[in-house]
A protein has these predicted regions:
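Short, structured loop/turn "capping" segments at alpha-beta junctions
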Residues: 135-140, 180-183, 206
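Short, contiguous alpha-helical
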Residues: 54-95, 144-203, 243
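Glycine/small-residue-rich hydrophobic helix-like segments
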Residues: 205-245
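An N-terminal domain-cap segment
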Residues: 20-68, 77-79
Length: 280
């Protein structure tokens, strides 16, 4: 747990308004996705035979299952036919659209071992990244309703969420196998800043005029203000990767609260932390 923040005039790092984090361009998106899947592949290549069956924070998914999901997701990005195969069926009651695609990705690859799955991922990801960059302006005209929050713009899905999904699964596997996650401010810091940008869109309206400062420690961290135009009256401090695990739904509120330090208006900080959720 981090120590409480000291007076802003002496020690607090400069904070950026999360809503003002620059949006992702298509060119940057392709570069970020390329760097991320390259890191993901390198992690897969470093795993040993004992790692593939290990459980992960993704319910019912092993390390091998996450690799199958990523191979399937990039195969869907590389081929329209495969994309429609994965996404053309309506979800069941209580499911989200991505639950259907995920289930199909794993079912189609049920008999494949890690080496075959990794070979598939390597073969399809360059085309997937290129096609998503090409199609983002067109699909950006479409926003799909979601039962769990604001609608999902498909341009945002193509330019931001797919790369974020790979990034988050790299974190899942790093934690599951006890490996340190490769982190740099330029790459992972940008990933995290975009998470805070989305958090501002989701959480900001719920805070009204109030504002909360999020201080995330580590190589990919930083400080951001979420909420109204007023000066922040509360601070939430967490380690960056723990914050993303929580924001993605992999920690309960109780688990996140135990890892966070709240200061200032702690009631406001608790309200903000409870409502912290972002699509990954």
């Amino acid at each position: 747990m981090l120590t409480s923040a000291l007076p802003a005039s002496t020690t607090q790092p400069a904070a950026q308004r999360a809503a003002e984090v620059p949006a992702m361009t298509r060119t940057e998106s392709a570069a970020l996705a390329t760097a991320e899947v390259t890191r993901f592949v390198a992690l897969m290549e470093a795993l040993g035979p004992e790692d593939w069956a290990k459980p992960t924070p993704c319910t019912a998914w092993s390390v091998r299952d996450i690799l199958a999901h990523q191979a399937g997701a990039y195969a869907g990005g590389a081929s329209l036919r495969e994309f429609l195969h994965q996404n053309g069926r309506p979800p069941k009651a209580g499911e989200l659209a991505e639950d259907v695609a995920n289930r199909i990705q794993l079912a189609d690859r049920a008999g494949r071992g890690p080496a075959e799955l990794l070979a598939e991922l390597k073969a399809v990801w360059p085309q997937a990244v290129a096609r998503r960059k090409q199609l983002a302006p067109v699909v950006g005209l479409i926003t799909l309703p979601r039962p769990d929050g604001p609608g999902l713009n498909l341009g945002h899905l193509f330019t931001v969420i797919y790369a974020r999904d790979t990034w988050m699964h790299r974190l899942d596997i790093s934690r599951a196998t006890g490996r340190a996650m490769q982190l740099t401010p330029e790459h992972d810091g940008r990933m995290v800043a975009l998470v805070l940008r989305d958090l501002a869109a989701n959480l900001g309206p719920k805070l009204g005029d109030a504002a909360v400062r999020f201080e995330l420690s580590g190589a990919a961290g930083g400080a951001w203000v979420v909420g109204g135009s007023a000066a922040p009256s509360a601070t939430v401090q967490m380690e960056t990767l723990d914050f993303n695990i929580y924001a993605s739904g992999r920690f309960s509120y109780a688990e996140a609260r135990a890892k966070a330090t709240l200061s200032g208006d702690t009631a406001l900080a608790e309200r903000a932390l409870r409502a912290t959720a972002v699509l990954y």
